[in-house]
């Protein structure tokens, strides 16, 4: 009976399989590790085509993390999936305001979503932030409105909400306006796991 594979061996083998299955598809070298990390997380090769990067987005995200920026997520799941040990070693932390009672109360009073209010709360943070949005398109819409009003300047927007209502439009708005560097999963696919995977792909390039 052969010995069970170690986690690192499993990951290395998985990435080798991904590379093999991608075949002769050409990925931009600066984006390749992000794309493969997302495929590794989802087993979905569509992301090789649907992930859209603004020029130098990966380099800008890595530079921001090296500078000690924080990460803001729209779900506790995304927050849980991000490698906080590496992030903390760089001087950053992860924030998610979605579950804060005062955010829920304000959203109810104003008749807007908690995601919308949570982005307003995040805009008050006193340091650069990467915004990793994997669930709520209204978070992206809120971010776009805040950027238009010069109330927030994201170091990077990871726009990968999943679903059917406002999802595609919110992503395209981030791409079309191009007010901040972005990594966006075009179409309906995405999710908190994808948002966390992209954050980790950037962090692992710093600590590999």
Predicted segments, located by residue:
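C-terminal functional extensions of proteins
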Residues: 165-208
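N-terminal glycine-rich anion-binding loops that anchor highly charged ligand groups
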Residues: 26-40
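Short glycine/serine/threonine-rich phosphate/pyrophosphate-binding segments
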Residues: 78-81, 138-143, 164-168, 191-195
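A short, well-structured juxtamembrane/interface segment
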Residues: 49-64
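Long, charge-dense
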Residues: 87-125
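Charged, compositionally biased N-terminal leader segments and the immediate start
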Residues: 1-29
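Buried hydrophobic positions in well-ordered alpha/beta secondary-structure cores of metabolic enzymes
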Residues: 74, 157-159, 198
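Feature captures the catalytic cores and cofactor-binding loops of soluble hydro-lyases/lyases
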Residues: 125, 139-157, 166-169
């Amino acid at each position: 009976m052969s010995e069970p594979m170690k986690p690192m061996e499993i990951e290395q083998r998985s990435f080798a399989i991904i590379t093999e299955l991608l075949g002769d598809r050409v990925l931009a070298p600066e984006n390749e590790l992000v794309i493969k990390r997302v495929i590794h997380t989802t087993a979905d090769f569509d992301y090789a085509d649907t992930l859209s990067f603004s020029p130098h987005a990966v380099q800008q995200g890595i530079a921001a993390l090296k500078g000690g920026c924080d990460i803001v997520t729209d779900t506790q799941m995304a927050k849980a999936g991000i490698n906080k040990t590496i992030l903390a070693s760089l001087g950053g932390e992860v924030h998610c305001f979605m579950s804060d009672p005062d955010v829920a109360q304000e959203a109810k009073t104003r008749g807007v979503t908690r995601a919308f209010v949570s982005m307003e709360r995040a805009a008050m943070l006193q340091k650069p932030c990467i915004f990793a949005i994997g669930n709520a398109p209204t978070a992206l819409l809120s971010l776009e409105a805040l950027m238009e009003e010069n109330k927030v300047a994201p170091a990077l927007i990871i726009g990968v909400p999943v679903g059917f209502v406002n999802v595609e439009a919110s992503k395209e708005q981030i791409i079309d306006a191009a007010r901040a560097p972005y990594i966006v999963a075009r179409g309906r696919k995405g999710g908190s796991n994808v948002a966390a995977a992209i954050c980790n792909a950037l962090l692992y390039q710093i600590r590999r």
